[in-house]
C-alpha cells in the first residue's frame, strides 16, 4: 500500500514538475519521493545541454515549491531538493536508454537474468522484441539481453 502511494505521489509530482522545468529549457530526469521520519523528501533531478547552474536549481525550486504547495503535494511537510543528475545520471525513460547507447551503465534488476542481478557494462542497443523492450549489454566480453521491465535502477557509469 505504501509503495503504491509513493509511486502515485511520484507520478503526480512528475506531471506537475515536467512543464515547469521544460518552460525554463530544462529536461526533467528523475523525481524521488522518500518518506522521512517527520516529513517527505522530494528530489528533482534536471538537466540540459551544457549543464545546470545553481541559478537554474534555485529558480526551479522556487517555482516548483509554489506549484506543489498549491496542489498540496506531498500531503505533509516536505523538503524539496533540486539538482543536476550528476555524473552517474539515472536512466529512467526509454529515451534515456536510446540516448546513452554506447555508454557504460550500471543496472540492478528485480530478478536475475542468466544468473546475474547486477550488471555493469556497455549499453549496446535498446530494442523492442515481441512487444517487450530489451537492453543489450556487453559485460566481460559477453552479451546479455535484459528486459526493461525487470530494471529496478539504472545509472550511467562515469570513469575518472
Curated annotation (Swiss-Prot):
Task: Give the GO biological process terms.
Answer: ribosomal small subunit assembly; translation
Instruction: Quote the Gene3D superfamilies the UniProt record gives.
Output: Ribosome maturation factor RimP, C-terminal domain (2.30.30.180), RimP-like superfamily, N-terminal (3.30.300.70)
An example of a Gene Ontology cellular component annotation for this protein is: cytosol
**Superkingdom to which the source organism belongs:** Bacteria
Cell compartments where the protein resides: Cytoplasm
Q: Which UniProt keywords apply?
A: Cytoplasm, Ribosome biogenesis
Cite the Pfam families for this sequence.
Answer: DUF150_C, RimP_N
InterPro entries on file? Ribosome_maturation_RimP, RimP_C, RimP_C_sf, RimP_N, RimP_N_sf
Spell out the CDD domains in the cross-references. YlxS_C
What task does this protein carry out? Required for maturation of 30S ribosomal subunits.
- Hey, which family's this protein in? Belongs to the RimP family.
State the protein's name.
Ribosome maturation factor RimP
Starting at the broadest rank, the lineage of the source organism is:
Bacteria, Pseudomonadati, Thermodesulfobacteriota, Syntrophia, Syntrophales
